[in-house]
Amino acid sequence: MSATNDPTPAVRLSKNLEYLKPSETVSINQETQRRRAAGEDVIDLSAGEPDFETPRLVAEAGIRAIQQGRTKYPATAGILELRAAAARHLSLLSGGRPVNADHIVVSTGAKQSIFNACMTLFGPGDKVLIPSPAWVSYPQIVRLARAEPVMVPGDIEWSLKVDVRALEKHRDGRTVGLILCSPVNPTGAVYTRAELKALVEWTRERGIWLISDEIYRRIHFGSGPAPSVLDLPDELLGRVLVIYGVSKAYAMTGWRIGLALAPAPVAKAMGALQTHVTSGASHPAQWAAAEAFGDERLEDEVAHMVEAFRHRRDLVVAHFRQHMPGVEFVEPLGAFYFFFRVDTYFAQRRFSTAAEFCERLMADEGVAVVPGDAFGDPRWVRMSYAASEKDLTDALGRITRFVRAMEEATASA
């Protein structure tokens, strides 16, 4: 049926979606799957999830919960067993500091925890600072809360991180929030304890809420977990929320369990909000997550996964230094992402954005990566090394061939 004869009336969508953009990481993943289904040879380095399987003990706990009939509505803020296990886990990660399980709200993934936090704390007229480059969903979630995201560019001399001077330049009387991620998606940079302390003190002095996304905390290539705001004294944390979960460290992205640790009044409000959104996270999945947090036997599996990511990080860094020495990058200290710069090719008129670079790389070499446009900086590209060493080595060879072909074309022009 032609468009002119289509009897379907025009659809008028809500203004809530007026400024909302689809997730580019999801879109690229869908395009990768489409090409693979068509028989194309595509290596996917766009994924934001570990390539490991959920640990057997965790999977069995989820199956056992189903077999035991734990499939009814759960407590809205999360089953006590999971909140208690998460509190003990977070306490151990930060040297035994007390963590109150009553201040934890379990949600359907860390993304929903961030959504709940923004909907609870921010509203029309408010501004929320977001260090850039940043995960694609932060500004979109802030907009859904009817607040205004304010991107704060990171300093290349400082692994694209921000400090209080950068934040202060972008603050005004409407600034009420800061969303921080460490280890950082998309760069893999990690804020030190001293850097976190300076940021927390700055927000506290100005009455600004800090949402600290620590979903990658366990995937850290230094000693122990990455530094956390929970390593700081209690008196600094009155306006701080911590976002955490099982997706990354325990390879449980599809189980959809995340959590927020918040001051008591905020946790209560987030729980109330959740009663009207999801009524709580999947009941069997919560039991699986409780196993992940509570079973010490899983620590060896987490350590093995982190060591595998460290090895792959080293492989990628060494390859770029040896075979693409002219390409600038951020050396990652955590997570499983590698962020490299491509705007040198803009001046040569090969491309005008990182998105075009990624499109050509996919078309010419069959490698899927994510343009920095998605993260707020169109000069860069994010690739994930959450892939097998074989695929990673093959993809690095293809990227090198692609970059060299551009350089040769420029030299002969």
Model regions and ranges:
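Short beta-strand to alpha-helix junction loop
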Residues: 77-78
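PLP-dependent class I/II
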Residues: 1-13, 18-23, 28, 35-43, ...
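Glycine-rich loop-to-alpha-helix module at the N-terminal edge of alpha/beta enzyme cores
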Residues: 45, 61, 67-73, 84-94
